[in-house]
């Protein structure tokens, strides 16, 4: 299931787009396409758009590696993506339910993290109970 919601949030006027797809590599193209479309709205260069697409793909692949493979309560396991569009930046926050509370993302020195750090201006990760998330921010050059 894919769900897209666009809304204005708060007084700052940031646009927020929420997208949830089945936690499967087959659906990463949907997230890459959404990323490219939103980055184009901010007038990122073609190289910057491609960098963001690759970064989102890598972040999602890292999350899928530790995602739960069986749904809880009969629902489909989902990879959720929250895009926040400001005047000068795009922030992408992707989350998945964990296979177990002991699951961890790769170490910060890993090749995957080096790729993310090179492609995005800010990168952070959270593992909270039964959910893991990666946040990427790319700013438009002034």
Predicted regions and their residues:
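Bergerat-fold GHKL ATPase/HATPase_c domain
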Residues: 1-54, 76
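Conserved beta-strand-loop-beta-strand hairpin that lines the nucleotide-binding pocket
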Residues: 1-18, 62-142
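Hydrophobic aliphatic residue packing
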Residues: 54-56, 120
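Hydrophobic residues in the alpha-helical elements that line and stabilize the ATP-binding pocket
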Residues: 59
